[in-house]
Amino acid sequence: ATADTSAVLSGLDADTAYDVYVVASADDPAYTSSLSTTVSANSSMATGGTIVRPEGEDYVVHIFKNTGGDQTSATFRLNRDIDVHHLVVAGGGGGGGDVGGGGGAGGLLASIGGTAVARSAGDHAVRVGRGGDGGAVGSAITGIGDDGFASSAFGSADDDPGVVYAVGGGGGGTWGAGDPGTEPGRDGGSGGGGGGFDSASDKSGGSATFGQGNAGGAGWQGMFAGGGGGGAGGAGTPATDNSGAAGGAGLAVAIVPATTAAGNAFGEVVGGSVYFAGGGGAGANGAAGAGGVGGGGDGTDRANETVGAAGGAATGGGGGAPGGPYGGGAGGSGVVVLRYELPA
């Protein structure tokens, strides 16, 4: 053998060390070297999160969720250089309180359907954001929904080299008692919907982050109807009468089969597809707006006397808004899914 001869060892048990020797010939082992090296089989190509190989597929996914706090931090450890697909969804914005606009969906970034990204062996940071709290009742300042929290993979800050960084959804606007200037929906991954009450005030929806979502809808320029929160697949609907507007649709992402998503409780499964980042529905004096597919929370009407519905967990959906003096629903938490092919 020459100095650069290589070989592949197969059939090794995971996490078991093996001593390797070199012999001159399998038929004539007269010469056997001293110990050449010790090798061990890696138990996996990567570790971190919940590891799933969907039935019948030749790839593995690592699923990361928010388990507490504004952001849950985790480590994705690669045991070798491989190409990795990603789905990164931030937390959704909270719905606005007191005749509010729906919360904007968390920003969504996905490589599936395109080219997987080359990633180097080593430890890589993952963070998964929670949804923003719904707006309260009592003033325009407290009535605006809170923004959702960012999610990221392969880094923590938005300027880290190679990071995939999704911006939290914008909070929904509110009716603006005593301070009409605070009514608009907030900017975010997708924008929050504008609040609805005073016809003289600004009811515009919040703007979206480029490539991550869509704008929120405006509240009605009459009275008592908020705009829908933006979703990853479509803008929030503007209110046009005394009825609340629907949240923007989320986006179907085929990073796993629907059965895998349902079995591991992330995304919203509809018709065999898995949707993420739907906008929150708006509240109104009349009929309330529905949340967008992909975890958007429904709005409520004034007669129901309830808070807006929360966005779906691990979907990044925006929170729904109420049609009366009640609180907005919290945004749904985000999710990070990382996928790589198994060697042939």
Segments the model singles out, each with a brief description of its role:
Residues A14, S25-S43:
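Extracellular fibronectin type III
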Residues A1, A30-S36, G286-G295:
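Acidic Ser/Thr/Pro-rich low-complexity disordered segments
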Residues D19-V20, V126:
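Hydrophobic beta-strand segments within extracellular beta-sandwich modules
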